Design a protein with these regions (language model features):
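Gram-negative/organellar outer-membrane beta-barrel architecture
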Residues: 1-59, 64, 146, 159-162, ...
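Transmembrane beta-barrel domains of outer membrane proteins
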Residues: 9-13, 23, 66-70, 109-113, ...
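Outer-membrane beta-barrel proteins
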Residues: 20, 29-35, 74-76, 95-98, ...
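Transmembrane beta-strands of outer-membrane beta-barrel proteins
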Residues: 21-25, 68, 82-89, 122-128, ...
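C-terminal outer-membrane beta-barrel translocator/porin domains of Gram-negative envelope proteins
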Residues: 46-56, 60-177, 192
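C-terminal hydrophobic structural anchor segments
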Residues: 171-204
Length: 242
């Protein structure tokens, strides 16, 4: 996929912890055969004719609104408080009109300090819900995904994709040394064509142990050792999972 995005967001801070905003963007996207020899192209694995938006050039006008409340004690290395976000976007296909849709994103992070101040219970829940206009589709590259270093860590990047996704994560974090934290984590999540199609039995689960390097105020890197029904996956990253 190749393309360009041009636009602007306007943000308002009525209070230090509260952000309200919106924006207008033009998205020019082109999809086609992959050129990375390490991975098969989409049409080599799936029937390209059945993949929504494959091979189509789309020009979207995206109007968005968002609100965020950030009550974390330290945004770079939180131990208490939380961050709560909601985003709504409307995508208008300016070419064929075949890919008009709405997208709602909800993200909740909450941190519970345990009696020993060197331990924290970190909780995260997120959902992405897309709703195409009557007779339209959501292009595959705009559909929510699960898998990879931030969501269902025991599965490869983009392992699951559909019109709707839900993700729940929990981490028990403790300070092993002044610059090193340990973490036990569990991720569960699901993608589905409709919200009603989501079921508890359809949830995928991953679990594992992680190690995080940090300074007194900032996060530096993490190593997560994740397990799922598809095997073991080590993940070295330089940004926090949440």
């Amino acid at each position: 996929m190749k393309g360009t995005d041009v636009g602007a967001d306007l943000l308002w801070h009525p209070r230090p912890a509260l952000t309200i905003g919106g924006g207008l963007w033009h998205l020019d996207q082109r999809t086609g055969s992959g050129d990375d020899p390490r991975y098969p192209s989409v049409e080599d694995v799936f029937d390209g004719a059945t993949v929504a938006g494959f091979g189509a050039d789309t020009n979207f006008l995206r109007a968005a609104a968002r609100a965020e409340l950030d009550l974390r004690d330290n945004p770079l290395h939180p131990h208490a408080g939380g961050r709560y976000e909601i985003h709504f976007s409307r995508y208008e296909d300016r070419d064929s009109g075949a890919f008009d849709f709405d997208r709602l994103e909800v993200d909740v992070q909450h941190y519970v300090p345990l009696p020993n101040r060197y331990r924290t219970l970190a909780l995260h829940a997120s959902g992405v819900f897309t709703d195409p206009s009557a007779g339209d589709q959501v292009p595959f590259q705009q559909q929510p995904t699960l898998g990879g270093s931030h969501a269902l860590r025991g599965f490869r990047e983009f392992r699951f994709r559909d019109l709707n996704s839900v993700l729940l994560q929990a981490e028990y974090r403790w300070e092993a040394w002044w610059a090193l934290d340990g973490a036990l984590f569990v991720d569960v999540g699901q993608v589905a064509p409709t919200r009603r199609a989501m079921t508890l039995s359809g949830m995928e689960a991953t679990y594992g142990i992680g190690f995080r390097i940090h300074s007194n105020k900032a996060f530096v890197s993490r190593l997560d050792l994740a397990f799922s029904r598809e095997g073991f996956l080590p993940l070295l990253r330089f940004e926090h999972v949440f």
